[in-house]
Amino acid sequence: MARKGVDVAVALVLVALAAFPAVHSIGVCNGVLGNNLPAPSDVVTLYRSKRIDAMRIYEPESKVLTALSGTGIAVLMDVGPALPSLASSPSAAAAWVKANVSSFPGVSFRYIAVRNEVMDSAGQSTILPAMRNVQRALAAAGSPIKVSTSVRFDVFNNTSPPSNGVLADKSGFLRPILNFLARPARPLLANVYPYFAYKGNPRDIQLTFATFVPGSTTVNDNGLTYTNLFDAMVDSIYAALEKAGTPGVKVVISESGWPSDQGFGATAQNARAYNQGLINHVGNGSPKKAGALESYIFAMFNENLKDGDELEKNFGLFKPNMSPAYAITF
C-alpha cells in the first residue's frame, strides 16, 4: 500500500510538470470522425514531422494519449460525453481526472475543455458545474491544468465594427462562466471562422480580407486598423469581454480553418491562403491585444463521417492517407 501511494504521488508530480509545456502560437485539431483515418501513433508521428507542437482532441482516447506520451506536444482535451456526470458529481469528476489525466503522466496537458459549442439550454446549464468539479478535481490531484469551455462565435453580437462587440447570450449562461474564468486567470476558448462570415456575406466581405491576402480592404475602428477579418472577429470578442466586466480573460482560438472543397469559396487555394496566413499571423496577436494569440487550426484530416454539409468533411490539412490536401508550412 505504501509503495502504491508513492507511485501515485510520483505520477501526479509528473502530470504537473508535463502540464507546463512551452507556449506556442499554433496547434491543429485532431478529429476522428472518419472510417479511414491513420492510427494514432502515425498521427502523432506526422505532427512531430511537421513540427506541430499542440493538438486538440475532442474526448479522452487512450490510444491517442498513449501515443502523445513523452512527445512534448501540448494537448487541449475536451471531456467528451461525460458532461452530465461531471456536472452532477464531484466524485465522478475526480474519477474522470484519475482515469484520463493522472493515468497519463507523460502527456503535456494544457487545457481541459468542458465540451465544444454546447447550444441547448439544458446542456449549457451543466457547463459551469462541470467546470468547477473538474477544476477542483485537478487541484486535488496537484495539477495546474486549466479548465475552460469552447464557444461558437455567435455567442457574441454586434461584432462589426469590432469595438461594438457584446455578449449575445440571451439565456445568461456565459456571464457566470466568464466570472469563473477570470478568477484565477483561465482562458475562454472560442471557435472563430472567417470562412462562414465570408460565405454568408460575400457581397460586403472581400475574399482577400477573409483569407489574410493583402488587398484594398481595411477597417478603421477606435484608432485601430484591421487588414483581415480574423483580427476583427477576435477583437470583437475582447470588446464583448470588456463590456461583460471580464477584461482580463484571455482568448484562445480553439478552432479556425477553411474548407478546401464542396462549398462556396471552398478551394484548396483559398484554404491554403487562409491557413498559411493564420500560421504566419497569430504570433503577432491582434490590433487590440499584442502578443502571440494561441490558435488551433481545424483540422488535421478530412473526416468522411462528419455531420452536416459536405464541406464539413473537407477542412483537413491532410488527406486520410496523410498526403497534404495542399502545401502548408509550420
Curated annotation (Swiss-Prot):
Residues 1-25 form the signal peptide. It is an enzyme of class 3 (hydrolase). One of its GO terms (biological process) is defense response. The keyword tRNA-binding does not apply. Its EC number is 3.2.1.39. Keywords: Glycosidase, Hydrolase, Plant defense, Signal. Pfam families: Glyco_hydro_17. One of its GO terms (molecular function) is glucan endo-1,3-beta-D-glucosidase activity. The active site is at E117, E255. It comes from the Eukaryota. The keyword Hydrolase applies. PROSITE patterns: GLYCOSYL_HYDROL_F17. It catalyses: Hydrolysis of (1->3)-beta-D-glucosidic linkages in (1->3)-beta-D-glucans. PANTHER family: GLUCAN ENDO-1,3-BETA-GLUCOSIDASE BG1-RELATED-RELATED. May provide a degree of protection against microbial invasion of germinated barley grain through its ability to degrade fungal cell wall polysaccharides. Belongs to the glycosyl hydrolase 17 family. This is Glucan endo-1,3-beta-glucosidase GIII. The lineage of its organism: Eukaryota, Viridiplantae, Streptophyta, Embryophyta, Tracheophyta.
